[in-house]
């Protein structure tokens, strides 16, 4: 039995879960999410909780059991609280600003980097060097943060670049000159 898969998912107040096989829809105060559920698992929706069970003990069913439960839980959390990822920009002259649906980044290139934000994602900029990527879909929030970081990943010598707020960069010693 999957230790994660057998846990029930509590439904907070204001969140509605609708399951019409194979699609599950979750609606809440922050928005709506829908996802297709794979084969091998059964979903039982009550007023207070959602439980995920598997039909049999095949490898496919066992692997889908915990995954399905976690995906549904992320949907419920997303429409009730939302998700956010914090990014930091380090470097002289490196900065960010948001204009409408476009994130403008100055990252030391000869040109500014303009990144169009996906639908449902908002970015707040604090002090031009701290970014907060927010949204209701955990996958899209993480993917957007990873794409922003990929424009200029942190380098190991001075630490310049875009990094996650909780990320530690292994620093290297520079060259030592001959004497």
UniProtKB/Swiss-Prot annotation:
It comes from Citrifermentans bemidjiense (strain ATCC BAA-1014 / DSM 16622 / JCM 12645 / Bem). GO terms for molecular function: rRNA binding; structural constituent of ribosome. Part of the 50S ribosomal subunit. This is Large ribosomal subunit protein uL6. Pfam families: Ribosomal_L6. This protein binds to the 23S rRNA, and is important in its secondary structure. It is located near the subunit interface in the base of the L7/L12 stalk, and near the tRNA binding site of the peptidyltransferase center. Keywords: Ribonucleoprotein, Ribosomal protein, RNA-binding, rRNA-binding. One of its GO terms (cellular component) is cytosolic large ribosomal subunit. Belongs to the universal ribosomal protein uL6 family. The keyword Ribonucleoprotein applies. The keyword Ribosomal protein applies. InterPro entries: Ribosomal_uL6-like, Ribosomal_uL6-like_a/b-dom_sf, Ribosomal_uL6_a/b-dom, Ribosomal_uL6_bac-type, Ribosomal_uL6_CS. The gene is rplF.
């Amino acid at each position: 039995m999957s230790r994660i898969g057998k846990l029930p998912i509590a439904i907070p107040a204001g969140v509605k879960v609708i399951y019409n096989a194979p699609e599950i829809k979750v609606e809440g105060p922050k928005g709506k999410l829908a996802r297709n559920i794979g084969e091998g698992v059964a979903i039982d929706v009550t007023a207070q909780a959602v439980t995920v069970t598997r039909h049999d003990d095949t490898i496919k069913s066992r692997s889908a059991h915990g995954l399905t439960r976690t995906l549904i839980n992320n949907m419920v959390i997303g429409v009730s609280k939302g998700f956010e990822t914090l990014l930091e920009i380090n470097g002289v002259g490196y900065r960010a600003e948001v204009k409408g649906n476009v994130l403008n980044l100055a990252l030391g290139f000869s040109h500014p980097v303009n990144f169009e934000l996906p639908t449902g994602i908002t970015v707040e900029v604090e002090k031009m060097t701290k970014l907060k990527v927010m949204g209701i879909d955990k996958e899209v929030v993480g993917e957007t943060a990873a794409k922003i970081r990929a424009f200029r990943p942190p380098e190991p010598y001075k630490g310049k670049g875009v990094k996650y707020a909780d990320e530690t960069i292994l620093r290297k010693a520079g060259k030592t000159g001959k004497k």
